[in-house]
Amino acid sequence: MATILVVDDEMGIRELLSEILSDEGHVVEVAENAQEARDYRLRQAPDLVLLDIWMPDTDGVTLLKEWAAQALLTMPVIMMSGHATIDTAVEATKIGALNFSGSF
């Protein structure tokens, strides 16, 4: 059983992923924006992060860069977006994202 942090500003996405992952036996924590994700990461490191790209306060790529610069990128991160670009996927992967899930 893994602890998974779901970071997405859309409540429906957070709820859906939380339900699916919980049903599979995982512990799911949610953050509705980058600041909540920062706060959570400072308290503990999840086993996996599902990170949205487009959020109102700070985008997911910027948050990924912050974690990498602060040596806090110690867990796998899968980037998510319904409005992805190839360039964004490549950038996130170069920073340290494990994978990128989205429609191009």
What are these regions (language model features)?
Residues 11-29, 42-43:
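Two-component/phosphorelay signaling modules centered on CheY-like receiver
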Residues 44-50, 55:
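Active-site beta3 strand of CheY-like receiver
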Residues 62, 84-99:
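Alpha4 helix (beta4-alpha4-beta5 surface) of REC/receiver domains from two-component response regulators
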Residues 45-47, 71-76:
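His-Asp phosphorelay/catalytic-motif detector in bacterial-type signaling
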Residues 39, 61-73, 91:
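Short amphipathic alpha-helix used as the core "switch/output" element in two-component signaling
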Residues 14, 56, 70, 81, ...:
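The feature encodes the CheY-like receiver
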Residues 10, 53-54, 79:
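The short loop immediately C-terminal to the conserved phospho-acceptor aspartate in CheY-like receiver
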Residues 32-36, 59-62:
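Acidic catalytic/metal-coordinating carboxylates
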